[in-house]
UniProtKB/Swiss-Prot annotation:
Protein name, as recorded: Cytochrome b
InterPro entries assigned to the protein according to its UniProt record, in alphabetical order: Cyt_b/b6_C, Cyt_b/b6_C_sf, Cyt_b/b6_N, Cytb/b6-like_sf, Cytochrome_b, Cytochrome_b_C_euk/bac, Cytochrome_b_N_euk/bac, Di-haem_cyt_TM
Organism: Sorex asper (Tien Shan shrew)
Entry binding sites for heme b b562: 40, 139
Function: Component of the ubiquinol-cytochrome c reductase complex (complex III or cytochrome b-c1 complex) that is part of the mitochondrial respiratory chain. The b-c1 complex mediates electron transfer from ubiquinol to cytochrome c. Contributes to the generation of a proton gradient across the mitochondrial membrane that is then used for ATP synthesis.
Keywords: Electron transport, Heme, Iron, Membrane, Metal-binding, Mitochondrion, Mitochondrion inner membrane, Respiratory chain, Transmembrane, Transmembrane helix, Transport, Ubiquinone
Binding residues for heme b b566: 54, 153
Membrane protein topology class: Multi-pass membrane protein
Subunit comment: The cytochrome bc1 complex contains 11 subunits: 3 respiratory subunits (MT-CYB, CYC1 and UQCRFS1), 2 core proteins (UQCRC1 and UQCRC2) and 6 low-molecular weight proteins (UQCRH/QCR6, UQCRB/QCR7, UQCRQ/QCR8, UQCR10/QCR9, UQCR11/QCR10 and a cleavage product of UQCRFS1). This cytochrome bc1 complex then forms a dimer.
Gene: MT-CYB
GO MF: metal ion binding; ubiquinol-cytochrome-c reductase activity
Length: 336
């Protein structure tokens, strides 16, 4: 991502007048510019698929018991989401502009300082030149901060060693990283590259929004403003609350709730490997998140509103109430 981003930055201009044209120029005139652009855009999607799988794996096997590692991971998730959001603004298409307008506007829900804060971030009274320029600057710097944080993430992981599916100590079974893990990892890397190249070379716009091929126009709002697919679940939670501040809080908490998970671990076992009821609830949570992702991309109309609200309630209920109680129930089943 950093490499493709670097090559894109060589040809991109962060001015409202030329940003859209510069992206078009990259795709049409720069040698393999189209490839670099689509690798970067779809690489972000693959990045998020990996992150979601990584977080899901951590939840399933109780890896969140490594508190420092887990909390830095949550911080990393926020940083990557911020980076992806700002990157989406850079091509300066309709969805770029209106996405930036809608999401930055959410900060105005903060009491007292809200409206001042929004204008400070915009660098004016609307999303404009100043906003685009600073978003480009931040989008360039953040990945390096993320890379550094990922180093710290690993540093703390190495204090304890990694977890395994059984949730038991694996000290007795440790083997050299090379050649064993290096060979094993090649499979995953090849699979990742296969999916990414298939996306980029066969349907590069599959995950994008056609509205972003229309240059940004402050006078014309697109009929359906929605973020990239990897934000849709959070967007659905935001929209399911008919109050601005409430929605913003729910949006932030939908991710921040991950930091609370270690303190809600009531089971006497670490992993879900031998806990069928918790497993069942975990997959219900996954299905719920997929439902939210689907709802986030739908218009705000009758079946979708209520489905989104129910899915949002279920999301918080599962994590905060149902799963901890089920863990206690499983403890009793084993006469512990």
């Amino acid at each position: 991502q950093i490499l493709t981003g670097l090559f894109l930055a060589m040809h991109y201009t962060s001015d409202t007048m030329t940003a859209f044209s510069s992206v078009t120029h990259i795709c049409r005139d720069v040698n393999y510019g189209w490839l670099i652009r689509y690798l970067h855009a779809n690489g972000a999607s693959m990045f998020f698929i990996c992150l979601f799988l990584h977080v899901g794996r951590g939840l399933y096997y109780g890896s969140y018991m490594y508190l420092e590692t887990w909390n830095i991971g949550v911080l990393l998730l926020f940083a990557v989401m911020a980076t992806a959001f700002m990157g989406y603004v850079l091509p300066w298409g309709q969805m770029s502009f209106w996405g930036a307008t809608v999401i930055t506007n959410l900060l105005s829900a903060i009491p007292y300082i809200g409206s001042d804060l929004v204008e400070w971030i915009w660098g004016g009274f609307s999303v404009d030149k100043a906003t685009l320029t600073r978003f480009f600057a931040f989008h360039f710097i953040l990945p390096f901060i993320i890379a550094a944080l990922a180093g710290v993430h690993l540093l703390f992981l190495h204090e304890t060693g990694s977890n395994n599916p059984s949730g038991l100590s694996s000290d007795a079974d440790k083997i050299p990283f090379h050649p064993y893990y290096t060979i094993k990892d090649i499979l995953g890397v090849l699979l990742l590259i296969l999916v990414l190249t298939s996306l980029v070379l066969f349907s590069p716009d599959l995950l994008g929004d056609p509205d972003n091929y229309t240059p940004a126009n402050p006078l014309n709002t697109p009929p359906h403003i929605k973020p990239e697919w990897y934000f849709l679940f959070a967007y659905a939670i935001l929209r399911s609350i008919p109050n601005k501040l409430g929605g913003v809080l729910a949006l932030v908490l939908s991710i921040l709730i991950l930091a609370v998970v270690p303190f809600l671990h009531t089971s006497k076992q670490r992993s879900m490997m031998f806990r069928p009821f918790s497993q069942c609830l975990f997959w219900i949570l996954v299905a719920d998140l997929l439902t939210l992702t689907w709802i986030g991309g739908q218009p705000v109309e009758h079946p979708f509103i209520i489905i989104g609200q129910l899915a949002s309630i279920l999301y918080f209920l599962l994590i905060l109430v149902i799963m901890p109680i089920t863990s206690l129930f499983e403890n009793n089943l084993l006469k512990w």
